[in-house]
Structure formats: structure tokens, C-alpha cells
């Protein structure tokens, strides 16, 4: 059912800029175990050559097709493979990178409890809050997950 959309998105990524179609990144999952998350690449290659940086609506690292994909969440579709691999579920807290988890825990130590469940493609926090562009917004989104 999703095959035509996946093929269309992959073709548009390939035509929009140089680089791989899929983007993979280490995230922290269930019980603090690292795993590779898959997404359609929405940014130009070497977007994080200066270190980890969260994206925002004004982010110039995003490709024109990447802007559209992120608005429609099409870039997240390859995460269904993460669900099939058992790394993620459909619904659960969004998985983050260790770099950001370390910062979040300094302000919100209870964040470690998020790793007691499998991370998800979507969550109540994503529905209510959307993407986070800084650590403070990540903490606010987490509060929607934990109902704090």
C-alpha cells in the first residue's frame, strides 16, 4: 500500500540533491540500547559536519524536497522498517540521540524512565507539540509523553 509513496519519496530525494536516499543515525531505544533509525534524507550531505544540531523551520541545511517531506512527515516512513526489526513501535516516545539525552537528563532526571518502553514513530507529545528545535522543547514534549 505504501510502496508507491516510498518509491516516489526515494526518487525525489535522489533527484533533489547528492547523497544517499536513506539517512541513518544512532538513537537510544528500549532499556537504553542503541539502534540505527532510518529516515529519508531531508538535508544536504554533511549537514552536521560541525556537530549535532537540531533542525528548525528556518534551517538552511534542508533540501527543498526535505522541507515538504518533514511538513508531511514523509521522511519518517522508513521507520516502519525499524518497527519490523523490533527497535521501535508505532506509538511511543520519540527516540533521541545520546548527545541530547545527556543534556535532557541534567534538567529532567526522570527522562531516563522514557527508556522503559520501546520508542515509537509517533507519540502524544509529537501530536501535541511536534518537532523540537532545542533541548527545552524536547523536555516540554517529553512532559506530554509522561503527563507531567
Segments and roles (model prediction):
Residues 55-118:
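A short, structured surface patch at a secondary-structure boundary
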Residues 2-4, 73, 120:
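Residue-level detector of functionally special positions within alpha-helical transmembrane segments
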Residues 85, 99, 106-148:
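C-terminal terminal-structure detector
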Residues 35-67:
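Acidic, Ser/Thr-rich low-complexity segments on the non-lumenal side of membrane proteins
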Residues 25, 79, 126-128:
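Glutamine-centric residue-chemistry signal
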Residues 39-42, 74, 92, 129:
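Flexible glycine-/small-residue-rich
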Residues 1-46, 82:
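A hydrophobic, helix-centered structural microdomain
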Amino acid at each position: 500500500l505504501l510502496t508507491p509513496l516510498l518509491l516516489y519519496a526515494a526518487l525525489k530525494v535522489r533527484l533533489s540533491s547528492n547523497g544517499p536516499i536513506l539517512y541513518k543515525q544512532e538513537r537510544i531505544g528500549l532499556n537504553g540500547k542503541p539502534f540505527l533509525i532510518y529516515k529519508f534524507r531531508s538535508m544536504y550531505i554533511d549537514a552536521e559536519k560541525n556537530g549535532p544540531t537540531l533542525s528548525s523551520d528556518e534551517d538552511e541545511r534542508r533540501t527543498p524536497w526535505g522541507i515538504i517531506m518533514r511538513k508531511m512527515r514523509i521522511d519518517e516512513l522508513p521507520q516502519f522498517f525499524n518497527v519490523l526489526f523490533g527497535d521501535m513501535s508505532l506509538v511511543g516516545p520519540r527516540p533521541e540521540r545520546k548527545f541530547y539525552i545527556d543534556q535532557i537528563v541534567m534538567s529532567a532526571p526522570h527522562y531516563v524512565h522514557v527508556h522503559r518502553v520501546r520508542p515509537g514513530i509517533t507519540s502524544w507529545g509529537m501530536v501535541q507539540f511536534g518537532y523540537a528545535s532545542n533541548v527545552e522543547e524536547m523536555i516540554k514534549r517529553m512532559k506530554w509523553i509522561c503527563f507531567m
